[in-house]
Amino acid sequence: TEIQVRVYPKSATFKRAIGYRMTPDAPLQMTKETGFHPRTSELTRSFGEYRGYWVPHRFTAAGPVEEYWACREKVVVMDLSPLRKLEIMGPDAESFLQSVFPRDIRKLAAGQIFYTALCYEHGGMIDDGTLFRLCQNNFRWIGGDDASLLWLREQAAKSGAQVLLKSATNDIHNVAVQGPKSR
């Protein structure tokens, strides 16, 4: 067989990548950097793959013990961009969500957010996360697992509700600011 040789200039950079699939039959996606990577890469070279994204494992200036105590006693910033985000829109959005979440969605006013579980009909938990009501017929679910997005899409198709479910994970990158001094 022929051997193909490519020559690259010294200035060429090559990014690490791992293939990720939402489901076994889903198209392969390569790991991505979050929107915060340019800044976090100045603070560490220790990144790990999490749900298709490279996120910091630890920062060079502090060790894991110091980071733990900062979270318990001070403040930390965590890149949570890999959390799964799903926009749920349409005239039946509220009634659809009312049928799939165990909380009373009708009590959630525009601009409010609450923590909830997402459960199967028999009560088994699929995922937990937050549901944000952006306006009357527009919501955003933020959960940790691809299974919740897939299950919500299945339920929307079964229900016949007039809702549009749009993945926003790649469009919205977020950090969590946590700890007792986070306010």
Model-predicted regions and their roles:
Residues 2-183:
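Basic, glycine/lysine-rich polyanion-binding surfaces/domains
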